[in-house]
């Protein structure tokens, strides 16, 4: 799947056209109030571009939460997003109480020029995901004929399809792959994601470093495997590190995370690294805790001493951080997926925070730094480094699947140029 060869919004003639745009407005809410509008703001450049370039209308569609195909307007309505959009754009936004059907089709057929229309939550229909739950909570599958009708109805709402929802690009949902229009382009947010990942995966700057953290080796086997074909160096930290250290060094790890499934493949991964000439850096010292708790008693341990019974490693120690700095300083391109400690708790955040500072410094001297979504993106938000690295991905699952070498359905369906 070539990421850099997709039709982009700026290459489409929009004059007089109705644009139907898949966005990611899956924003956090409390009592129907939006607590973080970042995802809405991220879609504004694409929306404004359409309006500035003569589009007749922009119809926006998104999911919110997991209603599983059951309409839950009290809990998961996108109506509060319409109000937020209106204040951000300074323009009226028409909110429709459904996303398909005759009334919606009529409202979108010939709207006044320059209209902005927001549809209700796509996931109120089981046909969006293809599966869901009935009113009693039993799992159900969508009927193929109804899915076709759902997709056909969405397709009537625009003349041009634009996808700007990278966060959902790994899902083959109706709004991602089922809108059947001649022109299917990526919006500016999607374009930025694809540009950075194409650079990382197809033509990386070297030396290329991957920093991989997180808990389970089994969850990251495909990621490690694929990246071993791409990188020059790899740091493996976080909870995953303990599985590697126990298998390779027979280290005592106390009650630290150990992944039985992942342990079986550690030696194969190391053999592949050696064959490909990839240098792997593992932690050598640890901040320990007597229980998995923010206020646990803390201690120190090293690779040589091991972690005592009843204790667990929740962060890397200063010697590991020093090793990581050396590797980061050498790199010309970095992809980082997964924290190297329990960064949510102050006592165990130092390792990840120090690594973040080093990645920021690397960016200043011209290194291309790409932060995979999910927890690592949360770290950037927590320490205000989002604009101090080259790119923070908006899609945790989508960026992970790209780095694993998978094809993203929401991208492959877009027109090639």
UniProtKB/Swiss-Prot annotation:
Sites bearing N6-succinyllysine, chain numbering:
6, 191
Residue ranges of the region described as Mitochondrial targeting region exposed following cis-trans isomerization by PIN1 and recognized by the TOM complex for mitochondrial translocation of the protein: 38-43
Residues binding ATP are 215, 220, 239, 313, 344, 375-376
> Residues bearing N6-(2-hydroxyisobutyryl)lysine?
97, 216, 220, 323
Q: Which residues carry this modification: Phosphotyrosine?
A: 76, 196
GO biological process assignments = gluconeogenesis; glycolytic process
Q: Where does (2R)-3-phosphoglycerate bind?
A: 23-26, 38-39, 62-63, 65-66, 122-123, 170-171
EC numbers on record: 2.7.11.1, 2.7.2.3
In the record, which positions carry Phosphoserine?
2, 4, 203
Q: Which protein family is it in?
A: Belongs to the phosphoglycerate kinase family.
Q: What is this protein called?
A: Phosphoglycerate kinase 1
């Amino acid at each position: 799947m070539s990421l850099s060869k997709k039709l982009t919004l700026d290459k489409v003639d929009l004059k007089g056209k109705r644009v139907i745009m898949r966005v990611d407005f899956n924003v956090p809410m409390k009592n129907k109030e939006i607590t973080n509008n970042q995802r809405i703001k991220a879609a504004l450049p694409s929306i404004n571009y359409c309006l500035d370039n003569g589009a007749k209308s922009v119809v926006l569609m998104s999911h919110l939460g997991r209603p599983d195909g059951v309409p839950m307007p009290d809990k998961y309505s996108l109506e509060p997003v319409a109000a937020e959009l209106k204040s951000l754009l300074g323009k009226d936004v028409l909110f429709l109480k459904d996303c398909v059907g005759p009334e919606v089709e009529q409202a979108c057929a010939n709207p006044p020029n320059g209209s902005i229309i927001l549809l209700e939550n796509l996931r109120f229909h089981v046909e969006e995901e293809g599966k869901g739950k009935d009113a009693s909570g039993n799992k159900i599958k969508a009927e193929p004929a109804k899915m076709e009708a759902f997709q056909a109805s969405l397709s009537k709402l625009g003349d041009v399809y634009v996808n700007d929802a990278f966060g959902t690009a790994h899902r083959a949902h109706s709004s991602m792959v089922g809108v059947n229009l001649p022109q299917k382009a990526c919006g500016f947010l999607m374009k930025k994601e694809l540009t950075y990942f194409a650079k990382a995966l197809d033509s990386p700057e070297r030396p290329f470093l991957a920093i991989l953290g997180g808990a389970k080796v089994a969850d990251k086997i495909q990621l490690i495997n694929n990246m071993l074909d791409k990188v020059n160096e790899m740091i493996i930290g976080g909870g995953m590190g303990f599985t590697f250290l126990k298998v390779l060094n027979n280290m005592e790890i106390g009650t630290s995370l150990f992944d039985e499934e992942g342990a079986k493949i550690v030696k194969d991964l190391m053999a592949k690294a050696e064959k490909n000439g990839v240098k792997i850096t593992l932690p050598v010292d640890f901040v320990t805790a007597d229980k998995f708790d923010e206020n646990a008693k803390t201690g120190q341990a090293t690779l040589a001493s091991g972690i005592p019974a009843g204790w667990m490693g929740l962060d890397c120690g200063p010697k590991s951080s020093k090793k990581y700095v050396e590797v980061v300083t050498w790199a010309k391109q970095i992809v980082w997926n997964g924290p190297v400690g329990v960064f949510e708790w102050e006592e165990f955040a130092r390792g990840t925070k120090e690594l973040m500072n080093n990645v920021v410094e690397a960016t200043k001297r011209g290194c291309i730094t790409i932060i995979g979504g999910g927890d690592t993106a949360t770290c950037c938000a927590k320490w205000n480094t989002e604009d101090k690295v080259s790119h923070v991905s908006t899609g945790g699952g989508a960026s992970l699947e790209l780095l694993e070498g998978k094809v993203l359905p929401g991208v492959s369906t877009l027109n090639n140029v």
